[in-house]
Amino acid sequence: MDLKKTLLMPKTSFAMQANLSTSEKNFHDFWKDKKVFQKLKKQNKGKQIKILHDGPPYANGSIHVGHALNKILKDFILRSWLYEGYDVVFIPGWDCHGLPIEHAVSKKNPSSYSNLSTVEKRKLCHQFALSQIAVQKEQFQRLGLLNDFQNCYYTIDESFQFKELELFLQAIKKGLIFQDLKPTYWSPISRTSLAEAEIEYKEVNSIALYLTFKVSKSDFLDENANLLVWTTTPWTLPTNQAIAIHPDFDYLLFEYNQQKFVILEKLFEVFTNKLNWTNAIKLKKFKGSNLKNSSYSHCFYNKVLPVLMGIHVVDNEGTGIVHSSPAFGIDDFYLCQKNKIKEVLISIDEKGVFNNLLNDKELENCFYLKANDLIINRLKQNNSFIFSEVISHREPHDWRSKTPVIYRASKQLFIKTKSIKKQLKKQINQVNFLNSKNQLRLKEMLLQRDEWCISRQRVWGLPIPIVYANNKPLLDFSTIQYTIKQLKKHGIDSWFEKDVTCFLKPDKTKKWVKYHKEIDTLDVWFDSGSSYNVLEINKYGSIADLYIEGSDQYRGWFNSSSNCGIIQNDLIPFKSLVSHGFTLDENGNKMSKSLGNIVDPLKICDQYGADILRLWVANTDWQIDNKIGVNILKQVAEQYRRIRNSLLRFILGNINGFNFTSMDDYKFSLEDKIVIHKTNSLVEQIEKFLEKYNFLGCLKVINKFVLWLSSWYFEIIKDTLYCDAKNNPNRLAKQAVLNYIFTQLISFLNIFIPHTAEDAWKNYSFNKKPISVNLFTKPTVFKVANSKNLENIYKTFTSIKNAAFKEIEKLRKEGLISKNNQIELTVGINKKIPKKLKDNLALWLNVNSVNLTNNENEIKVKKTKKTMCERCWNFQTIIKQKLDHNLCSRCFKVC
């Protein structure tokens, strides 16, 4: 007789090797063919709605690992809401306007692009954006996201754009829009103004220059005194229009080499030590206010200019005397305006090149940074140069082109965010944050800005619906309302095709007035900031339950969305807000092409599988920056194999063909009840973690549970599962417990590794199951009686087990035993233990027998002399012969 054939060994088609890179695509096809997402929406219709609003990624290029982190986190949240029984709303979106798309299109045909009309350029940009969206859609779906990507929003949708224009109209109604000539961030490479949200700071090396301006007139200083000035922008010196001195700081007049100089007293030692002016003589100390109404001569033009009192002057760097060029510095601009210096010398054009404003032939057509050397040489020629050095400091850069930006005065359109600060502050206090520090962070970002520059000098964007009469913007509500009405009638691109009169009320047009349309387009942050309107378009209101994006969005999307929401609806458009960190390489470095350390999420999916990438996300403390790389992914893959094989494959193999009825129909043993209780406790823990989006906490307790199950319960029930009669009540009860564990955990695993969960569900032999695990609703919890007593029993068992296994391990190392079931164990215990535990100790310890004594701490281990059953390999006293095989009484009956 072949004894192996009499055993009930595990059988399942759920493979040990996942082959995720291949199998995952099959499940995508399955979900699509079976319309699983549509069935899920239908199944949840009528339930309480919960909305996660998607911050739109930019429609250009392939997705990167940061995109993957973002979308996978959102998918975790959506799936956890579905588990809790909500009707979940998530509409994927794309940000489609802006410079990168315009650049990408122009690069394709650089010679012909410049000859195209505005509308032709816009059509090419529109087509390009849609092509990029198609690519990214497919890539996002590779991540196993629970969405069919059929109902999406694009910021170039007409419905979206007209909602955005309604927001603009509301800003007009509230008197928040104004035009002004003032310095804003300007990108010479992109040739457009930028908002603060589009700026990032980089550490760079720059020239720091010390120079002098000679006093021309002063009631306090001699005319031959030199004002020491420090600047890191020598190229702005030609447009110097004033010098700023802090009225309350202490300044010093000192003499060196028969020349007199003025500097901030606090910085005197630093300056003289730097130049080794050891013989400098201090002459007198005075307050900056003493130089009020003084004047000086320009460093190389024949001009006499004023010394102004400026409280923006700092005392921790430079000289405490600041050169002011109102065209290229915001503090300079406001200081000069306050002192009635209205002229703004904009000597740099939109490309960053000197124009002919200064009538300085040497500077004309010179790029601003290249002008530094020329200007320093001039200063040397007229003895105004003191010293220059290269310093490392932070300078603003365009966050898209990664190139330096400058402050440059130009006529722009602004929103008076100062007027809505009170509402913003009140509303932010009502938003839920996982971390209170982030609430403070957003509040600071919102309240530090008084205005928002919303105009961009680009073709590819939503046109600003303003008409000018004799170069003055018509900002009255009725005019703008009519203009938008005409755009709705003729289409957005009609703005670039039709005559200006089309957008003016006939009774408002006057023959003697010259009209023209605004040629700038709206800031892309105004686009994405108004994206909450998508919810209203889809009849879900205008407030989402949750916004979640990267931590850089406090100055970006979180900021613009808050401002737009207050302007349009007097409400911030989210109830809760959380942010995630950035992805770094394995060594903690920022990823970049130049370093060659970019981790491609699509390559991870092809090599390891999307479920491994998703499991990596679940294993991160995602609110901070996290590392990813080959070694980290290998660790994640090992964890995955444990879940797949030690948990899912073991269960599926042992419940194959099991006809489960109701949990009440089975008589559970003590160990069964403990496992059911532990499973219920695990479910409670996971649900609490999910409420806080603590996915790492979920994975930790799941892994701990799997290790516990596989090392104890699964080990001690193998004998029953494999060797008992198929319909033995005890065996059926064990199968019911395994089935219970599977049904309780599969929904949680579907949150994190949906392809694997679907694979397991496909191999789950229960004929009343839904077609997909995604349609499986939250299962009922089966409560076991006296759960506290079960905990105490297991706690007592654990203390016995830990002590006994130390001795057992000694015998194993000495080679005296190979299996625990060969052991006869004597354990001394000084306290009463429940009879139920006594009766189960041998089984739970997986040993042959246990003898309890009263001798505290006594532990004896010896090898049994009993005979081994050839079928179950257990050692028994009574052994029966059957067809030349030694069998225990149980195996004798089964065979």
Swiss-Prot record:
BP term (GO), one = isoleucyl-tRNA aminoacylation
Enzyme class comes to ligase
Q: Where in the cell is it found?
A: Cytoplasm
Task: List where the motif 'HIGH' region lies.
Answer: 57-67
Binding, Zn(2+): C869, C872, C888, C891
> Where is this protein primarily located?
cytoplasm
Query: Which NCBIfam families did the record assign?
Result: ileS
Q: What is this protein called?
A: Isoleucine--tRNA ligase
Q: Which gene encodes it?
A: ileS
